[in-house]
Design a protein with these regions (language model features):
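PDZ domains - specifically the beta-sandwich core and the conserved carboxylate-binding loop
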Residues: 2-12, 163-184
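Residue-level preference for beta-strand/loop junctions
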Residues: 4, 26-28, 71, 170
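Short strand-coil-strand connectors
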Residues: 35-39
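Short consensus segments that form the blades of beta-propeller domains
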Residues: 20-24
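C2 and C2-like phospholipid-binding beta-sandwich domains
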Residues: 13-16, 28-31, 44-54, 59-64, ...
Length: 184
């Protein structure tokens, strides 16, 4: 199968309301690690904060993928609490699927634009660990990045976002019974 070159842009604007691993009443020393197609980039550590305006662009170029690989590829964003003595601890993470980003309708084709997402720690998936505001773009050969939306539209999106996110997830248990009948 032939491979196509893709480019990924992730504009990390900010993280907000982080829940430090040492407890909700303390501050964190956050940094963000972005991984894509076996490559990683990270921000600097920001000391004693739970709200950080990173305003950092991550660019991953020449990601060679077959169509099947493209459909399974993800962009992983992890927020860590830096520790001097102990191992750095994961606060929360979020993953963007290439296919989902690529399939966004016009006018934001191939882009998820300035969207707040909930950061989750896999060890405690029912608890929100903070929020992240980012724009993600996946482009193939000859693609042109979408034109940014008006600043007025963006600011209203940002102000509304945390209200919309809230804790609304519920866990469910599903019980299946499968019967097999033969020679009835």
């Amino acid at each position: 199968a032939s491979k196509t070159a893709y480019t990924v842009y992730l504009h990390l604007e900010e993280v907000r309301d982080l829940v430090p691993t040492s407890g909700p009443s303390s501050l964190a020393d956050p940094y963000v690690l972005v991984s894509c197609a076996g490559r990683s980039q990270r921000t600097e550590i920001v000391r004693s904060q739970i709200n950080v305006n990173f305003d950092r662009m991550f660019i991953f170029t020449d990601i060679m993928l077959t169509q099947d690989e493209f459909e399974r590829q993800n962009i992983h964003v992890q927020v860590f609490n830096a520790n001097v003595i102990f191992r750095n601890e994961l606060i929360g993470q979020y993953s963007y699927g290439f296919k989902k980003v690529w399939s966004q309708p016009e006018p934001s084709q191939h882009q998820i634009h300035r969207r707040w997402v909930v950061l989750i720690n896999p060890d405690s998936p029912e608890d929100e660990q903070g929020y992240m505001l980012a724009t993600v773009t996946v482009l193939g050969p000859g693609d042109i990045p979408p034109r940014p939306k008006d600043a007025e539209d963006e600011s209203s999106e940002v102000l509304r976002a945390p209200i919309q996110i809230g804790k609304q997830r519920r866990g469910y248990n599903i019980l299946f019974r499968i019967f097999r009948g033969e020679n009835m």
